[in-house]
Amino acid sequence: MEELINKAQTLVEALPYIRNFYGKTFVIKYGGSTMGDKRLKEKIMEDITLLKYVGVNPVLIHGGGPAISEAMESMDKEARFIQGLRITDSETMSLVEMVLVGKVNKELVSIINRLGGEAVGICGKDGGLIEADKLIFEDKSIDLGHVGSVKKINPEIVLNLIKGGYIPVISPVGSSKEGDTYNINADTVAGKLAVSLKAEKLIFLTDVDGVWSDPSNEKTRVSSLTVNEVKSWIGEGKIKGGMVPKVEACIEAVTCGVNRTHILNGLIPHALLLEIFTDRGIGTMILKER
């Protein structure tokens, strides 16, 4: 009986959050590093489906780096990186598009639909969603090939899907006005899309428990940071590596009108629900100011 009472209390605890977030849009970035466990993947898709059923409009953007590297290895093609970005020649770009759009995206859509949601998979090329440019380094001698930056987000196709009651699932592949295809950092896409959609929240599901005050100690997670604190920590080297594009996307989002941003460990079952609908939270929230 006590277990049942605790479950009921959990539902009661979620009520004010459900009321506050009803009709709001959450942009959720699901990192490729958290996709390896099929059981956990199912849990995350359950969370997203439940969000839809309680009145939230979830928009899912996914990565897929490990799946791309695995596909390249199966074709005896070496994966090469510069500053964490994949060198993407024309052949690799075709492979990236095939894996992200044709495999990873459709698998996530299929899971959500099987769970009772109505998901539609698209990429940045559909409806002109992501207008991209070639990513240019300050060091002009570095050429990453078909790696792009976001020039413009045209959110109409996503807004129409939300209006129709669907859950958009988006691959971070965009195209230029000239028709060139580009692979774009999914963290960056998520941040810019959240701003364009005037989202209530931007949420990153990654493989660590948020931001740590000591990069070498996972027990030093901080529950919240302001934009100024994040900038300071980047300068001090407390935030580095793959966490940098995530927090930079969070900074842009909250500076441009997104209410809250969160970085969560997607390897924790039901991480989304625990962060959004409980009083405690489990990740790091980044906000404009306290």
Curated annotation (Swiss-Prot):
It is found in: Cytoplasm. Pfam families: AA_kinase. SUPFAM superfamilies: Carbamate kinase-like. Its EC number is 2.7.2.8. Pathway: Amino-acid biosynthesis; L-arginine biosynthesis; N(2)-acetyl-L-ornithine from L-glutamate: step 2/4. It catalyses: N-acetyl-L-glutamate + ATP = N-acetyl-L-glutamyl 5-phosphate + ADP. One of its GO terms (cellular component) is cytoplasm. GO terms for molecular function: acetylglutamate kinase activity; ATP binding. The keyword Coiled coil does not apply. GO terms for biological process: arginine biosynthetic process via ornithine; L-arginine biosynthetic process. Keywords: Amino-acid biosynthesis, Arginine biosynthesis, ATP-binding, Cytoplasm, Kinase, Nucleotide-binding, Transferase. Substrate binds at G64, G65, R86, N183. The record marks K29, K246 as: Transition state stabilizer. Its main location: cytoplasm. It comes from the Bacteria. Catalyzes the ATP-dependent phosphorylation of N-acetyl-L-glutamate. Belongs to the acetylglutamate kinase family. ArgB subfamily. This is Acetylglutamate kinase. The gene is argB.
